[in-house]
């Protein structure tokens, strides 16, 4: 016998004894459970229905103990069952399903979907006016627990919803009462209801009651069930609501302490403050000043936030001042222009200079270098020159600094310095101060801010702590001041609701979601279909989630286009769509990628434009509508003659329609209501072959026409993109801000660009072109950008010394160059 043979035989002998002892328990206990598990799994993948993820996850959870045990001891079990092919096959099947069940189910579902597409081909060809394309059919047939249909502009979003609804009724025999269709407006819900009913009657000869609702009407129905009566809606008009808020303001400001809080906010915190060093260019700072309408109470355009604060302090304390009045001594030289101190107090013959320096005397680089000097050195030279003038002419100078504002002592220090010079500091009465802010239209704007905040505060179910936690540190003091004036408004508002046994729109959703979570209302929906899903808000999300959590078998089918998410200002959160699985778990996603609206040139330009934002879901849309000529034209015109240029373009479109012997539809799209053309009747009369509608970009969503003109695509506060910014107090309650510049405005411009089937014209300005135009047509711009602020352009101007080139951002940017190019 060879060495080791006896030892090996003995080991084998004991192993056989061990496995013989285990074998009965495997056969009697584990194999029975495995057979049951495999039989269940086979039912999922050999049936006549789509197999969804939740079924598999529940199966896997049920058999987790067996799966874990077999995973650890698979080799031993195979050894034990040697020679028993049936049991080994069972063990193998279970192990395969447990470890790789997703792949097995995916293969089954692909086969199932292919079979359904074939079996339902007649249905898909006839249920809508035009046959559903393959992607639309696949979206209908997939029956996952959570389904996200990403529908590009013109790709048949509504067609897909109609197809899904009809498929559930006709093919899956779903009870219509268990299908809930949610839309964001009553008009959309009604249109969907009518369209589905008509198709069901015409094609399937079925009279079906369509359960299409808005989120609010669904919520109201739930509250009615819980209360056993239909609650009244408070303030049935916007006018009544605003009247109520004005009355609350007048009532609250009778109280001295509240009035002091209110005035404190108006005087110290009305506009959000950002220090100069927070900006990377002068142009950025100018845009911030303009976007937040940071002007003095005397309606002056000053160069900085800090100067406005100083001006308002002087004004509110009855100290007469002149802004940038030329110094009373002539100082003009080859090196410097005539000196103009920031403020002059004529009654006291005192000058005030506000220096934009930090504690180290430094300034941001964008303040501008001069010849061979860095920005800080150049600014310091300017400071020394100005101070030397006051010393030379023995004039009184008070100096303030940017770092004092950042430290919260700017006005306190200014007040002490003024007192040292004997300046009488006497604040206007509360009534006078409030009247000045009323006259400046600031109080109505603040009440509007409070109302907007109230709606978002309620709809998101925030607390004061939530609001402060969402705020950056440098805005917490301002936010705390705002909350002091907001809470009494909120308490009066809620008190009014209770006294009148009423609810508001926020209650319809928030309270309904609460009652669903508490099972005070139990639904029986098998399917929830949501249209325009990109517009969902966090409050509506919580409502939907409550419905799904209450009934795990309920399936969700959402259709939307993140490229067309344009309602963040009302609380919508596009990230709920772009991060769908984070909010709803595993989902089947499909992109409807064939547009039936516009041609390939409009498709390419618009798709490239919107996808510059990397956060948008990537889509490769396609179309069968191919054209040779470029259907997009950008026309540069002066804004004062834009309407005459608009008329010319419309007449040209009219001629094109006339040559075709047709009447064509046309949109004139503007960013704002006030910017709609005044001469629309004149245009329509001059263009009998056109049916013209003037609409805003927001209103144009979902609509289409043969031609479209997008007007006034310029830069500025009321430009496109909009130069106004939301108050941080409001944005703190909205979804997380997007990192990409003008993200929502970019999507809005995409919506405007994708309304035309055949041709689109964009009207812009060479003097104030929109940044979108700079991007779309950089070669078409003839004016040079300002090298100082970077956001303005240089245009020809006339002065006492003749023509020169100046920046369009004047008076904030005072860069000039003579016509020969000498600065």
Predicted regions and their residues:
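Conserved helicase NTPase motor core
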Residues: 25, 32, 53-54, 60-73, ...
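Conserved P-loop NTPase-based nucleic-acid remodeling module centered on helicase motor cores
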Residues: 16-49, 53-62, 178, 183-266, ...
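Coupling/switch/interface segments within P-loop NTPase motor domains and analogous charged loops
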Residues: 52-90, 234-296, 346, 400-496
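Conserved RecA-like helicase ATPase core segment
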Residues: 382, 387-388, 541-629
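Active-site beta-strand-loop-beta-strand hairpin of nuclease catalytic cores
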Residues: 339-361, 393
